[in-house]
Amino acid sequence: MKNSYRNLGTSLLTLGLVGCFEVPDQDHLVTAAGIVPGVDCQKPPLVALASTALPREFGITVWNLYKGQRKNWREGLNEYAKSQDLVLLQESATRPEMLHWLRAGDFQWQQLQAFTQGGVSFGVMTVAKTPQAFVCGVRSPEPLLRIPKSGLVSLYPLQGDPDGVLVVNLHAVNFELGMATFREQLNDLTALIHRHQGPVILGGDFNTWSDKREFWLNKLVGELGLQEAIPVPDLRRTA
C-alpha cells in the first residue's frame, strides 16, 4: 500500500514536483533487476570471502542530481563520475536516460525509493564498479512535506580489509522548523556506523545550510573519528 499526495502549496512546487506522487509505506530498493523489499540494517554479512573487492585506493564522486532537471547533467556524469569506483547520488531519477548511462558504464547500483511519480523512482542511489556485499536503507520523512529523505547504507569488500568499507549515502532532512528530525536521522545512521569495525565513508547532501546544522554534523563526525576528504582540485560551489 502506498500513500498518495497531490501538490497544493508553493513549498512543494519548489521541489520540482508537478502532479500526483506516491510515497511507499515500506522501504524498497530499486536495482537493475527490479524493485526488491528493503532489508534489516542491523544484520550485515561478513565480506572476507568476497571474490571481488574495491582497491585500497579508489575514486569517488558525490553529487545531488536535482532530479535531472538541470542542463548537461549527463555530460557532468560522464566527466566526473564515469571513471570512478564509487558514485553517491542524491535526488536520482530512474528515467530512461539515467538507466542507459548505468548500463553503458556496466555499473552495479541500488536506489532507495523515496517516492515515485509517473512510473519514475526518485531517491538516493549508490553506484559502483564492484558488487556490494550488503545494502539497506533508512528513510526519514520530512516533518513539513512528509516526503522521505534517505540514507543508503552499503557494505563493499575492500582489498586487504576483512571487514570491508561501509558507505553511507545520505540526503539529510531539510524542511523543518527546528532540528529534531535532522538530528534523529543522523543519530540513526551514526548507530549503524559505530557497529562497523572497518573503514567508513559518509557522503551526500547534508543540507547544512545553518551554523547549528553544521555544528551538529561536525560534532557527530568528530565522535565517529572521521576526517573530511577535500577534493583536489576543489571545484565545489554552493547553490
Label the predicted regions:
Residues K2-L12, G16-A104, T116-V120, N187:
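N-terminal, active-site-proximal structural segment of metallo-dependent hydrolase catalytic domains
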Residues A81-K82, R103-A104, Q132, H194-G198:
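Sec-exported extracytoplasmic/periplasmic mature domains
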